[in-house]
Amino acid sequence: MISTRCPHVAMATLMLFVGACSSTTSGKGSGGTGSGGSAGAGGKATGGASGSGGLSNSGGQSSGGSTTSSGGAGAAGGVTGQGGQGAKAGQSGSGGLSAAGGTSGKDAGPSAGAGGSGAGGSSGVEVDGGPHQAAYYVSPTGSDDNPGTVSAPFQTITKARDVVRTINSNMTGDIYVYLRGGDYRITSPITFAVQDSGTSNHRIYYQAYPGETPVINGATKVTGWTASTGGVYKAALDRKTKLRNLYVNDARATMTSKVVSSKGGTGTYPVTSGQAAWAWAGGSGADGVKYSTSDVPDITSNKDDLEIVNQTTWNENIVCVRDVVATSDGNRGLMLQQPYGAIAQLPDSGAAFSVSGSHEIFNVFAWLTSPGHFYFDKTTGTLYYYPRTGEDMSTADVEAPVAETLIDIAVTSNTGRVKNLTFQGITFANTDYNLYKVDSSYGKSSVQGATIYIAYGAGKSIHDWKYEILDTLPAAINVNSADSIDFVGNVVKHSGNEGISMINDVINSNIIGNFITDIAGSGMTIGHPQHVYLGDGGAHEKFAKGVEGICTKITINNNLVYNVATLRGFGSHAGVTAFFTDTLTFTHNHVHTVAYNGINLGWGWRNFPDSTTCKNNTCNNNRFTNMMTRLHDSGAVYTLGQMPGTVINENYVKGIPNNSSGPTYGLHNDEGSAYITENDSVLDIDKGVTYTINCEDYGAKHDLTILRTYATVNKMGAKPPNSTIDTPMVVTDAVWPLAQYGFCVKSGVEDAWSSIVPSSLLPVQDYVFPASCEAPTGTSSVPIRSSGNAANAVWFAPTGTTSFVAGGTMTKAAGDATSIAAPTTAGTYKLFVVDSQGKPLGESASLLRVK
């Protein structure tokens, strides 16, 4: 179904020229020609051609740091154009090509197929990207023996990268690698090192061929399904290790599971300090967990594939099983893989794996009784799957992931960063993660957030260890030691770990206009918990002096992060995690449906008041929807530790649950939060929350400025020292005054990038009119968002209206208008988008009240 806000790709002007050739002309192009993009009924055409991914940067040069790109998306940072010279973040090239290709955006939505589009191969014409040094083409149907022209493309991205290495030492213009549509299946990451950098202030682009969708796919396709028993199907899968993730018809399937009550621990696993590299201290933990034999069957094969997950108020942990035994008291004993089973019992503050309480056990074949679940028998190499309603296993696209990471950008010294790369219009899909390995054991445990315990350190807290006992997880895209790396207009989906991670010493880089969805952990992770100090040289420090660096000047703008922290065991991962960061700019993003909080900003609690590595961050004009779907004790925006110069302004929050299962807050300034300005928040939250904003005098919070909060409830604690905090203005029915409604309209993904938002997630009328508001009679201008098509009409009219005539109870604006007059008659109205044929496309959930 075609979205009402995203057209078919309007191919930008293409010109024939000799591909893979060197250009004698370098520098900035002169503006180029960007296609306006024709839009069908209900479609969207803005700026340059708004391709499937909605990219439209078609203008000329934009100076570094510019917040607009001429003719394009207007994304913060002046994101790279398609042609000409794009020397660094903030500098737009000037060629005319403006179709991103590849980002499925709203047309396809979260259920879009994984496969790429376009024929690839030898058809097509070469792309006129403006002045450049060279252009190469890659297609899944090409050959690495080819010269890399449009008629004879390479087959692999690594081949193109290696050829680029031979010509990029002293670049005279940008280099383009165009990826034709289709699946680029890999089993290990495509790596980029210093020798892969853009040089002489020029960039190297890896981007979609116009109108096509290249998919860097970390999975193998499973075929040959036959009926088994009880509605289950089976197929052969050549794999020797546990399968934790499976994707069927572009949707995640899950391992079989059952929630059971523990009978406590069994046995003891002792640890002696220094017995191995992971034994930082001595102690002991339970060696196994007991369950009733009526709850857990006798399991005789693939015992080491069993997993146990527990949930605390704000955390989840995973331990793995090595054996299943009968205990002396007549119970079933699941003996843990060690030493990770003991490590998982360490985290403090009630966040650890506990051998008592409620557990969810995964990977028992007998429990394969529900649609959308799978079981892999690695002993026989057989994959079993229970189809969802409507799935035909003879045609189903079943993807069994192999690769844990798809793109790995890294070097080992901050004197030799990877520089000046752009990845644009690409779909990154289908990764696995087999948990953290310590000796021969696996698991995933932490005290909080997108971190993982890596050693046994009993007797000390994470603060005592200066977080050296914590690490981050791998991601589908890993970036370290890099400068000016941009991800623009991509789709990142179906990850078994994190989405995009920029962990150590990444500077001047951008993540803009991406759709990030179905991620096991955080959609994006920036920084590292060990960056509380730089160069302090702890005994277990991950990053050596000269390698360690704060992530600085990272811009995250106009992204949709949807349905992340999806897997059990990953619940404490925020939609976006930022540890110690300097000048992080997080603006105009929409974070939707997260197990815990929308963004985790900061680290360190109150324990390191002299740390100066987290500062000058901005979190403005974002939208947070449907937070804390599993865990509690947080809010849409969560801050931790001091961060001088940080502003968190004009954010719109809709959907914080009540505290019946644990404490909940609209916003949460946790321990040590200080030197933060947090103004003009609009909080549409359940009246049963614990606090409107948890900024009370606890945990050494201080120097907070929180002004002009509007919320559906007023529940505030005692004010911390040196703080200025207004009492929230209460609007119980969430029908906001026009000024506050204006913040709602400005929040989230902007019009230039609206094509990344699936209509199935946010129908056009709710995109145009995102919140309820109240206006006095005679109001001539109520702000709205553009429907994206001037041929549409936008109406305020009474609910249920099917025939539209302007008058006292109905007002009209063009489909691309950004404001509309309120009806002159007092009453309650809805917003309708009507197509050029007069057909209403939908009635808004929000209302306008005219008084």
List PLM regions with ranges.
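Ser/Thr-rich, Pro/Gly/Ala-heavy low-complexity intrinsically disordered linkers and tails
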Residues: L16-A134
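Extracellular polysaccharide-degrading/modifying enzymes targeting complex plant/algal/animal polysaccharides
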Residues: A135-S481, D486, Y533-G538, K542-K545
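Short glycine/acidic-rich loop motifs that flank beta-strands on beta-rich extracellular proteins
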Residues: S188-P189, E404, D432-V438, P474, ...
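Extracellular beta-rich repeat passengers
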Residues: V260, N434, N659-L762
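Right-handed parallel beta-helix
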Residues: K419-N430, H463, D483-N497, V506-G521, ...
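Short, solvent-exposed loop/linker segments at the N-terminal edge
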Residues: S772-G778
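Short proline/glycine-enriched turn/loop motifs at strand-loop junctions of beta-rich domains
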Residues: S786-N792
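Extracellular recognition modules
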Residues: K830-V834
